[in-house]
């Protein structure tokens, strides 16, 4: 906790301290629970559903001081894969200059530059083989040579058992949203930028020897109930299609700064 007489330090890009951004996944007014078949969620279309998997990329963090100075986190240290099944992954921890910060900006997804870099520049969670491939826990389309930015799966009884739903009879929905604009030819671009004003919930006071934590709520219900409302029954599977742009537009509405712990 900061002292009452805390003085804002001079901005010095060589004087770095730790900043944490916490992505707290919720579903409406409830905490996210994976495999919640005993206590289903209900969306605006009154469809009951459970969630079996959630993963998304956060990258390219950028923060702005109360005086207007912008600091871009070193890109090599600015890629995070948040997993709903692993609470330890909810923190994006970076090092930034000591100071008072009133704005946070980040990318939901993986930028086109990194997406097209040689494999030795895409390690860890960016390794295309990470997670065992697209059909398992992987976040990379081998057939499309691109990252899945947002992977959201679950089950809902409203999904039909035919080709318009889930022919396997498992009533499964899959939303795999990606697309960085294309390498050699233009394609879908679902990269999204989120900017947050930290003033209402409290600015981040980053100091050496302490950890400031920006607490962000991520409401998954907005994936269905955002600007582009849709039903699970009508769109049980969305991947690399035109409709993915509507889902992607909803995703930016999931993020809301709740408070900051200094």
Regions found by a protein language model. Give the residues of each.
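A short, solvent-exposed, low-complexity linear motif enriched for acidic/polar residues
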Residues: 4-262
